[in-house]
């Protein structure tokens, strides 16, 4: 594992500048990955501290040898607990670059991509138990329908679920190639890649509890930031994007009461 296997950080200058870094401040990089954002933050720190989070153990190989940096190999939803554990009550700035890392997509054995035949794993935290294959083989029809509709926004969800349930009664679905063969009859022509991306996204989100973790993170970030502190979140058009924009523009998630927190979306 090496840094070059991870993507070059997007919006590097814009996101780090958005933190308005105090050289002696305390900062959190919630999506450490290859360490690109963290290295740029460290360049701008003097006696400050940077705490980097990543639940994927592969990221350990990219941790910089710098006394100002602390690495936390856990989900960012627990950021306040670890901030206190590291000896700080609040942070001056928090950065998160959401989504799956290119490293995870490109590691064939992790099962994140339909480009490779591999076990349907999809765990970001390799110590967790639930895998995509568990979902496909044990979830009820109702739960399968829920995740593919809500997390994948799949149009023909009933047909998709019927094919999965029928196939698993004959043989467990464990690998990508098997799964693609099972669902082939319901994959729209000329839209194969988009459809498969939606299906895989739904499984990945369920395996990793991504949306719940994101909501927890945003609530924790609100409480962890000092007055005047900054939260910078990089998102792409997605379910995550909607959650973040609701929180930053309205100070709450849909269906929740107002909170004394607001921000700007660019």
For the regions a language model picked out, list residue spans one by one:
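S-adenosyl-L-methionine-dependent methyltransferase catalytic core, i.e., the SAM/SAH-binding region
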Residues: 2-266
């Amino acid at each position: 594992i090496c840094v070059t296997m991870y993507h070059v950080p997007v919006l590097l200058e814009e996101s780090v500048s958005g933190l308005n870094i105090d050289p002696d401040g305390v900062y959190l990089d919630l999506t450490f990955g290859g360490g690109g954002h963290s290295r740029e933050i460290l360049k701008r720190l003097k006696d400050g501290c940077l705490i980097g989070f990543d639940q994927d153990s592969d990221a350990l190989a990219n941790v910089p040898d710098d006394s100002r940096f602390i690495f936390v190999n856990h989900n960012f939803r627990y950021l306040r607990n670890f901030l206190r554990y590291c000896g700080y009550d609040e942070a001056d700035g928090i950065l998160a670059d959401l989504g799956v890392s290119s490293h995870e997509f490109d590691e064939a054995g992790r099962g994140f991509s339909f480009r490779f035949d591999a076990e349907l794993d999809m765990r970001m935290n390799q110590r967790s138990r639930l895998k995509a294959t568990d979902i496909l083989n044990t979830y009820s029809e109702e739960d399968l329908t829920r995740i593919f509709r809500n997390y994948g926004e799949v149009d023909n969800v009933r047909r998709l679920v019927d094919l999965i349930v029928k196939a698993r009664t004959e043989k467990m679905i464990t690998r990508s190639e098997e799964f693609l063969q099972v669902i082939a009859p319901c994959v729209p022509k000329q839209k194969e890649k988009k459809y498969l991306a939606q299906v895989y996204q739904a499984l990945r989100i369920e395996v990793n509890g991504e949306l719940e973790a994101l909501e927890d993170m945003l609530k924790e970030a609100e409480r962890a930031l000092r007055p005047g502190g900054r939260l910078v979140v990089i998102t792409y058009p997605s379910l995550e994007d909607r959650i973040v924009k609701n929180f930053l523009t309205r100070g709450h998630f849909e269906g929740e009461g107002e909170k004394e927190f607001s921000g700007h979306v660019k």
